[in-house]
Amino acid sequence: MDIIHVPILGTCYPQLMRIIAKRTLREFWLSAPRYSDSKGPLEAWPAEATKASWNSPQKVKAQFRSASILKNGRAVFNIAGNKYRLVVSIDYQRRICFVKFIGTHKQYDQIDAEVV
């Protein structure tokens, strides 16, 4: 885990990931009964990600081996036993994940994950 050294009194704080747009995940599983099986995995993913300290794509792959690393700081995660795809944009320097897309494989095939 990376540590941020704060000059005031020499305190140190671990810098963990922040997830932006978690609401998008909740809206997805609430959007249709057929997506209700994604609720547990979509609650678990941010819980795991916020404990991480990803400062490189290699750290993402070390934690989530099935994740696909794309250009432009994008990563694709398999959700609910590979039934759904989650696309995030990761700012490794600031340790922020921006949720960009969640959908089925068919929906994922219709987007450009490096742009969405």
Language-model-detected regions and their locations in the chain:
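Basic, Lys/Arg-enriched alpha-helical interface segments
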Residues: 1-83, 91-96, 105-116
